[in-house]
């Protein structure tokens, strides 16, 4: 997505090539699940509030694993589109970690009018963490037909003034591949920290908030 590629951010995470990018991103996945396991503890009661928040962790792991598999397959479209969904999951966690009771809007049977607006979530995330909207916009460039993908499949060759085309997807540059790994690491760490914070606020030993009950008035099983 950058031309010429900028490797400085990748180097910050110890990424120097594709193999190290995949390795660092895999380590980030382990950190995410390890943190969740520590926060979760050995035994938990199961109810809809807990199950709802646990499902957000499942979504995070799904997007992480899917992005890793897509990157290994040299598929930038699937990689960046899944990263976009991963970012949306982080945006929801930012919202529910800071707004008491809003987790109820994700409960089964929640009214349609309570559905989250992605635009509103992104604006809120941008206010708290500058740069979120810019990254999301870049990811959206691959999720939708746009100028960012206008020359998909085309690549410069080692021979002077020659290009090649393949119908199968491929990352345009090594920098793009490593950038996908960087974002994967950052989103894994963000989702992990936000999920742990939200869980602790609702269900930790020194919980600050009471989880909204289910079903509430207006919700149906």
Give the location of each predicted region:
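A cross-kingdom marker of C-terminal helix-rich interaction/assembly modules
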Residues: 1-82, 88, 92-93, 101-221
